Amino acid sequence: MKQASAIPQPKTYGPLKNLPHLEKEQLSQSLWRIADELGPIFRFDFPGVSSVFVSGHNLVAEVCDEKRFDKNLGKGLQKVREFGGDGLFTSWTHEPNWQKAHRILLPSFSQKAMKGYHSMMLDIATQLIQKWSRLNPNEEIDVADDMTRLTLDTIGLCGFNYRFNSFYRDSQHPFITSMLRALKEAMNQSKRLGLQDKMMVKTKLQFQKDIEVMNSLVDRMIAERKANPDENIKDLLSLMLYAKDPVTGETLDDENIRYQIITFLIAGHETTSGLLSFAIYCLLTHPEKLKKAQEEADRVLTDDTPEYKQIQQLKYIRMVLNETLRLYPTAPAFSLYAKEDTVLGGEYPISKGQPVTVLIPKLHRDQNAWGPDAEDFRPERFEDPSSIPHHAYKPFGNGQRACIGMQFALQEATMVLGLVLKHFELINHTGYELKIKEALTIKPDDFKITVKPRKTAAINVQRKEQADIKAETKPKETKPKHGTPLLVLFGSNLGTAEGIAGELAAQGRQMGFTAETAPLDDYIGKLPEEGAVVIVTASYNGAPPDNAAGFVEWLKELEEGQLKGVSYAVFGCGNRSWASTYQRIPRLIDDMMKAKGASRLTAIGEGDAADDFESHRESWENRFWKETMDAFDINEIAQKEDRPSLSITFLSEATETPVAKAYGAFEGIVLENRELQTAASTRSTRHIELEIPAGKTYKEGDHIGILPKNSRELVQRVLSRFGLQSNHVIKVSGSAHMAHLPMDRPIKVVDLLSSYVELQEPASRLQLRELASYTVCPPHQKELEQLVSDDGIYKEQVLAKRLTMLDFLEDYPACEMPFERFLALLPSLKPRYYSISSSPKVHANIVSMTVGVVKASAWSGRGEYRGVASNYLAELNTGDAAACFIRTPQSGFQMPNDPETPMIMVGPGTGIAPFRGFIQARSVLKKEGSTLGEALLYFGCRRPDHDDLYREELDQAEQDGLVTIRRCYSRVENEPKGYVQHLLKQDTQKLMTLIEKGAHIYVCGDGSQMAPDVERTLRLAYEAEKAASQEESAVWLQKLQDQRRYVKDVWTGM
């Protein structure tokens, strides 16, 4: 430990201590400025209390250790207890009512619950949209005021089935007026000296009146619900009134219910309204981000009434909100106290009971965690949640005392921002400059804008989800056809995992299983060896759920082989917003079950609440049932009588397309999909691992063929051009040369366009002639004909710009080509090949790829070009299935048969892929006792801090004696560009020595420039060493190729 250091402190002013450093209306901002001056930790003495403030992410990581620190109620929150009592926000962790209420209310904020709130959220969001759409031109909008109305009405309706009807009032609801005044007074009381406070008689009387107004409304809500109970209403209030704590069996008393309602009405709207206000400000001051978010809203929110699933697909808008919370966390601090004497950072002593406050805005701008652009608004930094620095992002607080309503707030904010962007152009007509208003939370002060309606369809609202839930019929259980036992165990605090377990059991009964459910802890020491065991669980702040903790500890203590005979599968519930603990417990259970001898029925499934959870779950369930039925040799599946047969009539599995059948494709299940480039890079390279079926084999150096799908954006462009709907069903009939299409059977047009035809190929001459023949405008027809008649024009205007048939159809509306002709002219969607970057010697049924994601400005000058396959792969989630097949290249790109043969490997960028597999194989061979020949790897990338792929893994391989690595970089500032051929030239003598010893040379990557340059360098090396002519070096290299000692795996083009 370092020598103890005094904690920095600003200048002290006698009995006022450090108080003069605080500006009256800018308490939080004053503390931020002190942090700028004094650094990541400082002491601040108020009259009567001394506090420590931290903002450096390493120090925050320490104070967020719940074994050392717990939530502290500062003076401000203690004053809020006057009306918040021992509600969730203003209670101490040790108070019985916090623990009881926390357990009772958690299920209302599960992912499953969010879907139930969708129509109510949409109801209130629509009122905002309608209000703004009816404004006169140039009429000002007070953003924070309208967002306060919106978020109050939303929590009122979703939580308590109460309508504040704020949009139908000229002034704020009396509850809001009293609440805001009471919050401000509570904060003011916390800053006053004792004598000052005693003199504020009139202010204190108003404070009590405001508390009475809030209590009166809430007590009336409780009384009305008690007088008119409704079993069909499953909201927060019903849970508070009737639900029993699963631990104590007790319900909440009326006084605590009052405190909880007030807590949710305050916390459930103040922070979210501030978030939306700041988000609009950030977008208006960053037009390029506004455009990108608006494009996503247009692309995704295509229905008049947006569905829950569509809101989940607003990924960039969610990134905008996350980045807004990073720069402007609306709850800007949380306070803790030390449970025992401790030391921070190895040098700052903290005594027991010492308050420590985390300044979240400064934490979120810590350049040591976020990089040099920490002050910039860059939503893209949240594209890969796993890259978010651990303990450097805390907008919702920490651990078990983190905001219970996080998912609710983000779901609401995502919906509202998406709808606002879809329907309005936002105008910063005053050139507003940010001024932050402080109370318990922060928000933009006096932020006003104008809006202009966009040409979009009017929004309709139907509260259909609730009606659908009521109308659902209980599935009819079929009599068991085979009676195979199915035990579905769950670990659940929020209720999501338990609900999924119940649904899986119900599905199992319909399929003829004898199914039952139970908490994981109920089966400690008695997992059955007969039948299947399914485990559905979540992580809770990185720890097991309450009813799974004992099971996890029991698993850890088992010896290897003790679970032999148990057949199992795991599905995990999680949220990537908490990157550091995402899927920790499900993955731990899955790995330990396997390690202790159990047989895995299928790869783990992972549902991400920050993404399309239902899609992840459905994909895993389909795979689980298929592989479980196969494992137990069950052929008959009972019909699910509550599902219309029509819903499965038109399903088209990826491996059932004509192209897939032609290639013998099978389903690979995604086990991992992670970013390899750093957050500082603007590009993307993904490491993707697939589990392939038993019996499918591959070798190092093989290719994996992927049958991709066209993006939703591309497909939507086709639908829009031809006036089609995504749910239109068609039947294709035609001649034999169209055998790549699904003939003579119904198929949804969106499935056809997604999986069967190429939409991004440059238009062929034949296609252009056909387009011209269907064009009724003579000048436009002539333009199209000219593109075909002149080879130079065709190459320059079509091929060089990669203009597609769809591009021309959009450019020439007078072209009346029918959809069936368009479809007939499109080529079959071709497989894309990737070098396998793994070795079967490590995992026989796991294949990995290293995929460079193609996203760049289109050569046509029209927006962004996105590679079909790389973007399809990049967006796959764990548990998703991809149609794929294995191919061995004819070039002989395989490891030498003799491990002692030297190897020279050249693979810049993603060309490193096969060599990663080679190195894995060499590691296994070495462990088995083989003597390895020397191996050189030449790798190049742009910058060591951006795209040095697999750096740590390769460094370890080099330390283990498996390979010698030579690296070069082409984009390092103030340094000459370095490419692999330059390294080869430097190593001429070494290379020739190895080649004379029989070395095999492998080149993988770009075939247009890199590979020819490498070949030229090898020939020059031979000429220099042997004093040979160009002709002789050419013969020498050709001979190496003929002997399969010089092999290439290269590609050209975009």
From Swiss-Prot:
Flavodoxin-like domain: residues covered: 486-625
Region (Disordered): 462-482
A cellular component term, taken from the record's GO annotations: cytosol
GO BP terms, alphabetized: fatty acid oxidation
PROSITE patterns: CYTOCHROME_P450, FAD_FR, FLAVODOXIN_LIKE
Reported cofactor(s): FAD; FMN; heme b
Compositional bias ranges of the Basic and acidic residues kind: 462-480
Consequence recorded when altering residue 190 to Q: Hydroxylates shorter substrates with higher conversion rates than wild-type, and in contrast to wild-type, is also able to convert medium-chain alkanes and aromatic compounds
Site (Important for catalytic activity): 271
Region spans: NADPH--P450 reductase: 476-1053
Binding residues annotated for FMN, in chain numbering: 492-497, 539-542, 573-575, 581-583
Keyword set, alphabetical order: Cytoplasm, Electron transport, FAD, Flavoprotein, FMN, Heme, Iron, Metal-binding, Monooxygenase, Multifunctional enzyme, NADP, Oxidoreductase, Transport
Pfam families: FAD_binding_1, Flavodoxin_1, NAD_binding_1, p450
EC number: 1.14.14.1, 1.6.2.4
Functional summary from the UniProt entry: Functions as a fatty acid monooxygenase. Catalyzes hydroxylation of a range of medium to long-chain fatty acids, with a preference for long-chain unsaturated and branched-chain fatty acids over saturated fatty acids. Hydroxylation of myristic acid occurs mainly at the omega-2 and omega-3 positions, in approximately equal proportions. Also displays a NADPH-dependent reductase activity in the C-terminal domain, which allows electron transfer from NADPH to the heme iron of the cytochrome P450 N-terminal domain.
Family, per entry: In the N-terminal section; belongs to the cytochrome P450 family.
Name of the protein in its database record: Bifunctional cytochrome P450/NADPH--P450 reductase 2
Species of origin: Bacillus subtilis (strain 168)
